[in-house]
Amino acid sequence: MKGFLSLTLLPLLVAASPVAVNSIHNDAAPILSSMTSKDIPDSYIVVFKKHVDPSSASAHQSWLQEVHTAHTGRMELKKRSLFGFDFEAFMGLKHTFHIAGSLLGYAGHFHEDVIEQIRRHPDVDYIEKDSEVRTMSEGSVEKNAPWGLARISHRESLSFGNFNKYLYAEEGGEGVDAYVIDTGANVKHVDFEGRANWGKTIPQGDADEDGNGHGTHCSGTIAGKKFGVAKKANVYAVKVLRSNGSGTMSDVVKGVEWAAEAHIKKSKKGDKKFKGSVANMSLGGGSSRTLDLAVNAAVDAGIHFAVAAGNDNADACNYSPAAAEKAITVGASTLADERAYFSNYGKCTDIFAPGLNILSTWVGSDHATNTISGTSMASPHIAGLLAYYVSLAPAKDSAYAVADVTPKQLKAALISVATEGTLTDIPSDTPNLLAWNGGGSANYTKILADGGYKAHNAETTVEDRIGGIIDSAEKAFHKELGAIYSEIKDAVSA
C-alpha cells in the first residue's frame, strides 16, 4: 500500500513542470509533456542539438520526409490488404524553426513509429508534445474609462481628480514597431490612425482577420490614439490563435520566429525613422521549454518582449511564455491597487500593470470598443511602455540610436523606475512593483536618474483606498453643488 501511495502522489509533485514520457531508451531523445496543458494528439515539436547548423537541419528534414512517406505507404498497403482496416492520415512536417540563429527545429503531425525514429536520430536534443495555447483574458464586464493609462502615469493611487488623466510625451512610440502575437488585429480601426498592419497568419487556412477581438484589444492598449500607452507606435498583427482564442504551441513558436525575422530585416535597412521593436504575447499554456527558448532567442535578436503572467492565481513559473527569463512577465493589478484575484504571481513575475476592466479597441466595426480583464490586458500596458521608452531612447540596433539600450537594459530600467510597495495581496516571493511611464516626461535619462519610488500609501488597505476615491468624489460633488446653489441664489436676488 505504501508503494502504491507514493506512485499516485508523484503526478501531484511534478504536475507543474514538463515531464519526460516514453523515455525508456537511454540513447533516445526525451519526449516532454506539460501536465498543465492539453496535448494535441500525435503532434510534436522537435528541437535540434546546438551543433546542428541550417544545412544539417535541412538534410535531417529531407530524411524525415522519406521516413514519413515510407510509413504512409506501408499503411496504405495494409489498408488495401486488410478489409475493414482504417488508419489516421498524418500530415507530416508542419513548420520549420530557425529563430535568430539559436533555436533550430520543426513541428509536425507524426505516427508514433516515425517519432521513435526521430528520437533516435543523433541531431535531436528533445521532442515536446505540441499543446493548446489560449488567450489570457478574464471575461467581459461593463464598459468604463481606460483608467489603466492614468494609473501608470501617476505614482500614488488614483483619486477623483486624476482618475482619467493620462500624462505622457506626445512622441511616445514614434518609430517603434510593435508585434502583437495573438488572434490578429482589426487593422482598419480608427484608433490606429493607419498605423496598424497585417503581418502574418500562421494557422493554416485561417483568414487574415481578427475573428475574436482579443488581439485587437491588446493592440489598442499598446498603440491606440485614445486607448494606447505609446500613441504613435506601429502595430503588426501576427495571428497565431484562431477565432475561438486557442491554438497550438507550435504555431505560437512560428509566430515568434516571424516577428524576430521581421525585426532583424527592418533593423538591417538602416532606416533613420526606425527606432526598435517590441512584442506582446497575451497568451499562454502549460510549461513549454521550446516556447521559452523561442522568446529568449527573439529577445537576443533585439526585440523588447512583454508576456502575460497567466490567470490561474498560481505560480507564473509553471506557465509559458511567462517563464521565459529574458521577457518581462506581467501580472495584473486593479483600480484599488491590489493584485487582481486571477493574476498569477511568484518570482517569474517581474512587474504589475492594470488588468481589470480595461477599455480598448474591438472588432465588429472600425469604431468598436470593449472592456475585458486579464493579465492579457496588463501585458500590453508594458509592451506599450517598452515602445514608449524605446522611442525616447532608441534601441542599439537602430540607425537612429543615441543610446545603448538593449532589451536586457531596458527591462532593468523599467523595473528600476517602477512604483514600489503600492499593491496589496502580493505574495512574499513576488515583486511589489507597478509600472510607471515617467509621469509625462520625455527625458529618458532624467526618468532613469530619478529612479524608483516607494508609495506613501503602501500600508493602507484596499478599503481605505476605495474610501479615499469615494471621499474625493463626494467633496468635489458638494463643492460643485455649492457653486451651483450660489449662482441660483445670486440670480434670484438679482
Swiss-Prot record:
Residues under site feature: Important for catalytic activity: 311
Signal peptide residue numbers: 1-16
Alphabetized PROSITE patterns for the sequence: SUBTILASE, SUBTILASE_HIS, SUBTILASE_SER
GO molecular function: IgE binding; serine-type endopeptidase activity
Propeptide residue intervals: 17-136, 454-494
Pfam families associated with the record: Inhibitor_I9, Peptidase_S8
Glycan attachment sites: 244, 280, 443
Domain Peptidase S8 per the UniProt entry, residue ranges: 146-448
Catalytic activity, EC: 3.4.21.-
Keyword Ribonucleoprotein: no
Annotated spans, IgE-binding: 180-198, 209-231
Record-linked PANTHER family: CEREVISIN-RELATED (PTHR43806:SF11), PEPTIDASE S8 (PTHR43806)
Protein name: Subtilisin-like serine protease Pen ch 18
Lineage: Eukaryota, Fungi, Dikarya, Ascomycota, Pezizomycotina
